[in-house]
Design a protein with these regions (language model features):
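Predominantly soluble domains enriched in secretory-pathway, periplasmic, or organellar proteins
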Residues: 21-386
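Bacterial N-terminal signal peptides that target proteins for export
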Residues: 1-11
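Bacterial N-terminal signal peptides
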Residues: 10-18
Length: 386
């Protein structure tokens, strides 16, 4: 384990404004990738990019407002859940799956860094940096805040960390048995003893069992669809939603629901939602599921599947079924989704636009507001509530 040294305390820290805690606290945090670009459908390294950053956003007000930005390594590669904020909004953990090769700035290579940011200091700052595995992407922390799991996309492993006093300590690494499994998203059930892990590369969802710092796998994996990716669990722990990204070839893609009340757990619904549904999120009350579809916005303009925008689709959750309620255009290369604590504001990351799309969600209707610029590509977004 390495604590953060001079890298964190020198020019790597960039603050927009001092972090003033809103009266009714409701923060979102975004992981912003500055080093990756998409030019006419080709993803590559940016030329002389500024540092990647984490933005801290006050969503207790409308429109939401960015109140601080801290330099920390991150990446768009992997599911848009590569950042986590503690329930008391005191610290953040963010992962980095890729970086520009220091000896060859024309190449992007796997990264393994995990950074911890203290939000209680003024200004907020990085206080620890530790390594996970190659392609460190998804970060999820147990409900009691004592155990963190990091999916290492480039090596097919899952890193296990203990969490105490805003510090991580490595306690193990689990080999998934397939270096091309591409583990993508992991989420704990409310009991803290069970978790789910999506495997984009071999089309599986694993059920994990947690006993202290020991993590084991159920021998029966779940099947949802082609390339299961982003994962979310509703507040009550009764349903999980999984985005099935498909092959990115223009075909319609899907979202599946997993019933968490039955033993064994099982997939109970799969519905077509759009093309490449990278982002998805349950509303705070669990009554709605928001899905962000890329819709070909990352492809070359010459592709027959190219669109100049993505789509945000909101579904009502009716038992174990989904019913479409509303749809609106969003920016290009859409990523993660977050709701405000009251469920009335929705934020969606758009990598190419370097901004968050902002919507009011009231009366079953989406009303777009002004985009919120975060300076570089918002690759992931999280709030403190589950």
């Amino acid at each position: 384990m390495t604590r953060c040294g001079s890298w964190c305390l020198s020019g790597a820290l960039s603050i927009l404004v001092a972090l003033a805690r809103p009266a009714a606290s409701d923060l979102a945090v975004t992981a912003n990738d500055s080093h990756s670009t998409n030019v006419d459908g080709v993803v590559g390294p940016a030329k002389n990019p500024p540092p990647d950053t984490v933005s801290i956003i006050d969503v207790s007000q409308y429109p939401p407002k960015a109140i601080a930005t801290v330099a920390a390594p991150t990446s768009v590669v992997g599911a848009p859940t590569s950042i986590w904020i503690s329930p008391d909004e005191s610290f953040v953990i963010v992962t980095a799956a890729t970086k520009i090769e220091p000896q060859d700035p024309d190449r992007i290579v796997p990264d393994d860094r995990v950074s911890v940011l203290d939000l209680k200091t003024s200004p907020p700052r990085v206080v620890q940096q530790i390594t996970a595995g190659e392609g460190a992407n998804e970060i999820s922390v147990s409900p009691d805040g004592t155990l963190a799991l990091v999916a290492n996309r480039a090596e097919g492993t899952l890193s296990v960390f203990s969490v105490k006093n805003k510090q991580l300590e490595a306690v193990g690494k689990i080999d998934l048995g397939n270096p091309k499994a591409l583990p993508s998203s992991v989420a704990f059930l409310p009991d803290g003893k069970t978790a789910l892990l999506t495997r984009y590369g071999d089309n599986l969802v694993n059920v994990l069992y947690i006993d202290g710092t020991k993590v084991t796998f159920d021998e029966r994996p779940l099947t949802t669809g082609v390339s299961p990716y982003t994962l979310d669990i509703n507040r009550d722990g009764t349903l999980a939603a999984v985005s099935n990204m498909g092959r990115g070839n223009g075909d319609i893609d899907t979202v599946s629901l997993i019933d968490l009340t039955q033993k064994p757990l099982r997939t109970v619904e799969t519905i077509s939602v759009g093309h490449s549904p990278e982002g998805l999120k349950f509303s705070p009350d669990g009554k709605f599921l928001a899905v962000a579809n890329i819709e070909g916005s990352t492809k070359s303009a010459s592709s027959p599947f190219y669109h100049d925008h993505g789509t945000l689709v909101v579904f009502a959750v009716d038992g174990n079924s989904l019913r479409k309620m509303a749809e609106a255009p969003i920016g290009r290369w859409s990523q993660g989704i977050a709701f405000s604590k009251d469920g009335r504001t929705i934020l969606v990351g758009s990598m190419i636009d370097h901004a968050l799309d902002v919507f009011r969600w009231e009366g079953g209707k989406l009303s777009p507001g002004a985009k919120l610029d975060v300076g570089s590509g918002p690759a992931a977004i999280r709030t403190a509530w589950p």
